[in-house]
Amino acid sequence: MDWEEVTKLEENEYKRGYDEGILKGIEQGYEEAFLFGLEHAYNKYLLAGEIYGRVCFWLKEENSQHPKIKKAHRHLEQLKSLLESLPTNNELEETDAGFDSYWNKITAKAKVVSSLLGTKILPAEKIDANDGFE
């Protein structure tokens, strides 16, 4: 080891550690983001499936004669249509609305149906209140 290497040892080790940290951060960041997205998508689609099941149940022939369901029939059909058109892939064309806009329409329509039927459809607490960031 010559004198110049000795004097720059700390600087070289710092740079090497910094570069290694950047690479590890990029690698782990993608993995964490993927898992975070997967978890939140699962929760939202699970709730969408539950709402869809309730809507299908209410729209059945024997249930559709109930006065409250008769009153909410049009809204139930619209909610069912929204749930059936919910995007299930990440490749959306520019003209298509994204998942969040569909989700906002679904929750708004579910609230209308909920008030008309006098039953709770959505959970009381917000599903993504803090989006995982505390």
From Swiss-Prot:
List the residue ranges of the region (deca-GX3 motif).
17-53
Say which domain of life the source belongs to: Eukaryota
Localisation: Cytoplasm; Nucleus
User: What processes does the entry annotate via GO biological process terms?
Assistant: protein maturation; ribosomal large subunit biogenesis
Q: Pfam families annotated for this entry? A: Yae1_N
> InterPro entries this protein is in?
Essential_protein_Yae1_N (IPR019191), LTO1_adapter (IPR052436)
Q: Name one GO cellular component term.
A: cytosol
- Key words of the record: Cytoplasm, Nucleus
Ranges in coiled-coil conformation:
none
Primary role: The complex LTO1:YAE1 may function as a target specific adapter that probably recruits apo-RPLI1 to the cytosolic iron-sulfur protein assembly (CIA) complex machinery. May be required for biogenesis of the large ribosomal subunit and initiation of translation.
> Quaternary state and partners of this protein?
May form a complex with YAE1.
Q: Spell out the family assignment given in the record's similarity comment.
A: Belongs to the LTO1 family.
Protein name, per record: LTO1 family protein C191.08
User: Native species of this protein?
Assistant: Schizosaccharomyces pombe (strain 972 / ATCC 24843) (Fission yeast)
The organism's lineage? Answer: Eukaryota, Fungi, Dikarya, Ascomycota, Taphrinomycotina
